[in-house]
Amino acid sequence: MMGLPSKQKGAEIIEFALILPFLLFILFGIMEFGIVLYDKAIITNASREGARSGVAFKCPLLTTAQIQAVVTNYSTGLVSFAAVAAVPVITVTPTPPTTITNCGANSGTGLTVSVSYSYNFLIFGNLFALFASGFTNPLVLSATTVMNYE
């Protein structure tokens, strides 16, 4: 059995060294965008939970601060790589009534809960900005839910 010619002995290592950066780029890209999708699902579900708790028939209705607390509690699973973890920005409109006499007055009207979150990329943030002009780091993820009062 003949061995490899002397010129071919290091070819596999060189080929692997050439392809390794592309494989790592794909691997980390899949991981990074998986985390972005996870965070998007978290804020979408958080806005739904906030709206659902706000429109449920209770007397007195939840206040804006209580609805924001529901969204904040649901958002604790967000993944961030920033030095200081970003806090989601929560907007509730219209402002729920605060008096007991107005409990049923909003029946059928909509309550909007909006959540936005700034995701900082771990690896690809500034790299993608070179290739895509509309890409920004941090990436702002947002979700809005509208539900009618019961």
Task: Annotate each language-model stretch with its function.
Residues M2-N73:
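Alpha-helical assembly-interface signal, strongest on the long, hydrophobic N-terminal helix that forms
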